[in-house]
């Protein structure tokens, strides 16, 4: 149902025009699905995923994270506080003037879908709390079947 939801929303928004994916039956969920338990000071460096589409769903987001971004000490020295936020990076990351990013402060029940190849990172927070999210990747069914066949031939 998650692949179907993504495909339906992406189609309505015109986001499937330049992809080979036309309907949800062409997407399959890759295993494993994983749970992220992030505690104070933990973070994920810039990375990307396999497959076509990645998804993250936030199950628990402590209110203290939002407070850090609106009232925290670093708000006095930064126009863009980043405590506990997720940032997607595009362009030539590391090249001045040729890259950008999109930063969100997750809320409970937020679901984000994005291209699996898109670099992203998660910033640390100071709150003595735990944030919980679930992540999954979707692959193109035909490509995944070819990959499995190739693995079997080795």
Residue positions per predicted region:
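Signature of the catalytic double-stranded beta-helix
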Residues: 1-50
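Catalytic core of non-heme Fe(II) oxygenases with the double-stranded beta-helix
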Residues: 31-113, 123, 130, 144-151
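Glycine-rich nucleotide phosphate-binding loop and flanking beta-alpha elements
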Residues: 120
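Acidic, two-metal ion nucleic-acid-processing modules in DNA metabolism proteins
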Residues: 133
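An acidic/histidine-cluster motif and surrounding catalytic segment
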Residues: 137
């Amino acid at each position: 149902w998650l692949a179907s939801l993504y495909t339906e929303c992406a189609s309505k928004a015109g986001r499937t025009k330049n992809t080979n994916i036309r309907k949800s039956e062409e997407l399959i969920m890759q295993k494993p699905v994983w749970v992220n338990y992030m505690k104070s000071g933990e973070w994920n460096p810039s990375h990307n995923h396999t497959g076509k589409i990645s998804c993250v769903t936030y199950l628990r987001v402590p209110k203290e994270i939002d407070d850090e971004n609106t009232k925290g000490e670093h708000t006095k020295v930064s126009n863009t506080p980043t405590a506990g936020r997720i940032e997607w990076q595009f362009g030539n990351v590391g090249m001045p003037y040729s890259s950008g990013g999109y930063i969100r402060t997750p809320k409970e029940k937020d679901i984000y879908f994005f291209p699996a190849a898109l670099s992203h990172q998660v910033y640390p927070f100071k709150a003595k709390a735990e944030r919980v999210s679930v992540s999954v990747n979707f692959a193109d069914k035909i490509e995944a079947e070819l990959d499995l066949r190739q693995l079997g031939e080795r």
